[in-house]
Amino acid sequence: SRPDIIYGETALVDLNRNFIGMRRLKAPEQLSRKSFRMGMLVCHQAFIAKRSIAPNYDLAYRFSSDFDWCIKCMRSAQTLFNTHQILINYLNEGATTKNRKASLQERYNIMVKYYGKTTVKILHIWFAIRFLFAKIFKKNA
């Protein structure tokens, strides 16, 4: 049978559609409904769900309805398939990038909704530590 969701990689492009590089977050080999605890590991444009499991976007979220939608789809899916292919060329600057703080707050709230406040707080402490180490090592490199 066909998978409920197929997903793949994302290439970043500039306004002239010139290749910049690959998205920092790589699509995991095995994607599951718990995967997005670590952030949006797959761009929604590189995430294709069967219509039968795909709900409407929750328009209460201005910047992160895609994040909520992907989690809802994964919660309904039985099979997810990694294509190991670049599925989209993604414009590096978009509405979410321009509204980063509001987008991050929405994503945090969505994560709490699906994964629980304690889990999300612990994960965000880990994200902060990882970010600081990356910054320190980048300076020293």
Where are these regions (language model features)?
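Conserved donor-nucleotide/metal-binding helix-loop-beta segment in metal-dependent transferases, i.e.
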Residues: 1-5
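Membrane-proximal basic amphipathic "stem/tether" segments
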Residues: 112-141
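Short, solvent-exposed polar/charged micro-motifs at secondary-structure junctions
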Residues: 14-18, 92, 129-135
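Conserved nucleotide-sugar donor-binding catalytic segment
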Residues: 8, 14, 21-102, 106
